[in-house]
Amino acid sequence: MQSRSQHFSLRAAFFFSGALSLSSGAIAAAVQTEPESEKLEIGDSQPGNYLSALIASADRDTPAAEVYYREALRVDPRNPDLLERAFAAALSNGDETSASSLGERLLGRDPNNNLARLAIAIRDIEQGQFASARAHLAGAEAMRGRDVTAALLTAWCYAGQSDLRHALDALDRIRDPSVFAFRDYHAGLIAALLGNVAEAQRRLKSAHDDDKNSLRFADAYARLLSAQGDSAGARKIYEDFSNIIPHHPLIQRALADLKTNQALDPVVHNAKEGAAEALYGVGSAGSRQGDELPALVYLRLSLYLRPSSDLTAVTLASLFEQLRQSDQAIAAYGLVPSSSPLKMGADIQIALELDGMGKTDEAMRRLTDIVAERPHDVEGLSALAELQRSAKKYVDAAASYDRAIAAVGIPQRDNWTLFYFRGICYERSKQWPKAEADFKKALELYPDQPLVLNYLGYSWVDQGLNLEEAFKMLRKAVDLRPSDGYIVDSLGWAHYKLGQYAEAAKTLEKAINLKPADPILNDHLGDAYWRVDRRIEAHFQWNHARDMSPDSEDLPVILKKIEVGLPDVTTQAPAPKASLQKEGGG
């Protein structure tokens, strides 16, 4: 049975969502942390700057949009549309100082602008002006509807004034059952901050009991128990969480600290950090639920209040990855403090983002430096091996996987990928006996793993080995992953390799329906059609494959087939490679 908190609706929390949507053109442009106005050419006319701002917004270039809107507004300061767009661009770009200033002007025109009230309230919280912040939150229309976000921030404002009774009262007015765990979590943090340990323990236990999958709920409750001298209770909470989500760096650090009897810091140390935690929670929910634009604003504001928050920085970076803004993802990962347990993972993600941007050499250098600094870190070694493998440096990648496997010690089920990918590297570097042994080891650790079944099964078919067992493996893989076009393709291509062309065509058609835009699969289906005398359809598929940016070594082969078709079976050239070039998974 799912916990109530797992149904937490982001829209229930976003009392500013209406205002956000009014300025979606500017907010959707969010890509960078700091405007780089020195690189921009400011126009001489207001219409020119306004047009540049619109173009920058369409290109998701918020720094430029903010600069151009500001310049356009400077020429036409009474334009309400420009004012709101400039405000939204500043807010989504993380420029809280400008946003709050523009927000003041917006409120002069529209006292019910909720987004402007939010920006000003957050500024007041940052400055310790909690009464003023509460006044702005109370002035928002949605506050009268018992909004979750407003209630959370109001409660933390009361906490900043050491008023526990009113803080808890603000939270307990929340009536949505889906948010009760979130409510109790913040009530517990406030009670702990203000010294009511019994109330803190009751509330945090309630939140944790409601959702044991929540990292924040588990961490906060365990830290409270540790502070009260219950190290065994804290350890059990962390260990139980590790059974659900293994190897989380924050949990591993906390367990290590408990083992050496080090004190665990509370989740928040003051009301400002508590408000940041509330914004982080709502923004994180938005990121998970695909409500990306409001989530971006909340995460930006959270970092404004607590710039050192590692979880917020990582969540913001992940959001930028969703938005395919690699530069901004890298900048956000760079905000993770060097002392954080998440720093290693953040540095690895920076390298992977660089690789995705085509900066593979720089990415490789970064990962090499990481591994040199921490030579026994499995995560770093695995990332380096993955990058080497994707660059087709199979011998180097296998050596990195060697080191990762050695660092693991006794392999467990979740280490199957190390053997699987090392096996691929061995297979690609013509070391089949080693590859076969690794694939078998991966299956020993994770029986019936479909990707491994697919790769080993096809490899056996390709070499004419263990054919009966190989086809059992391939069929099993398809049964387990019937919607994986690459795995279905492998079964079809195995039929083709054995001359079972009618069955191959039938199976490969299923693969194409699942993965229509892959050049290898289209090439395979074209070959199968040719063998069953469907020549026009064969050319159609080969032409598709040609137009889908195939690998450079495949393109000449495809062009040759388009020109002259396939040779007779008795004089056939070596068959094209199978789709396990994709490692069997989509």
Residue map of PLM features:
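N-terminal leader/linker segments that initiate helical-solenoid repeat arrays
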Residues: 26-86, 91-101, 111, 255-258, ...
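Residue-level recognition of tetratricopeptide repeat
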Residues: 54, 88, 122, 156, ...
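Position-specific recognition of the canonical hydrophobic site in helix A of tetratricopeptide repeat
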Residues: 57, 91, 125, 159, ...
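Canonical tetratricopeptide repeat
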Residues: 85-86, 119, 153, 186, ...
